[in-house]
Amino acid sequence: PALGFARRAKMIIDEYLAFLLTFVLVIPFERLWMPADRLSKGKQPILLVHGYGCSRGVWWLLRRRLEAAGHTVASVSLAPPHISLGRLEPILSQRIEAVCAATGSPQVTLIGHSMGGLIARCYLARHGNERVARLITLASPHMGSDMSRIGFGQNSREMTTGSLWLQDMAAEPLTVPTISLRNAYDNYVMPQDNQRLPGAQDIELP
């Protein structure tokens, strides 16, 4: 449904403020917001995978809420930030192994935001589902985004609608239960329907 002027203006302002908060206060001072992961044994951990141009610091609030709910939460920073998606995947792979070793859990739940959801799918395509119980993606450009044309780096080009990388990934079947959370008014994944992932449980957030 179409948004009225007031709601659209509020949405744009809220996104702009969130952008400033993330890149001016959160990421540059990540260590203040995100101390080392607290990995205790006995529970299957959640591993948070950030999106394009970000770091693990963007998860500071969600991590607090998940830990308050009793979950064991891990995170990863994918760097350098603008290399190929395929070259970022081994960083996630190494982190999954480290988290499983630290917690004693044979598997993790992956939550990937934006590009992080694509990296998670790349991991599953390369390594299978032995270490992953389920996948949740948040506003991931599964079919690409026209906005990626103005981004920097090889990973941005690979996230462009219709890229060969995305076509290759689309040919890979989902091997774990997957939920794709999306928003019909996303200002970064355009067209917004490109957040849909065939084979996943599709949930549109208000």
Please report, for each region that a protein language model flagged, where it lies by residue:
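Feature targets compositionally biased, intrinsically disordered low-complexity regions
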Residues: 41, 103, 198-199
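Flexible, membrane-associating and regulatory peripheral segments of lipid-active enzymes
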Residues: 1-46, 60
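C-terminal catalytic-base region of ester-bond hydrolases, centering on the histidine
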Residues: 173-206
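Short amphipathic alpha-helical patches
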Residues: 36, 40, 76, 89-90, ...
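Serine-dependent carboxylesterase/thioesterase catalytic core
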Residues: 48-52, 56-57, 61, 65-175, ...
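Short intrinsically disordered, low-complexity coil segments enriched in acidic
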Residues: 2-4, 117, 206
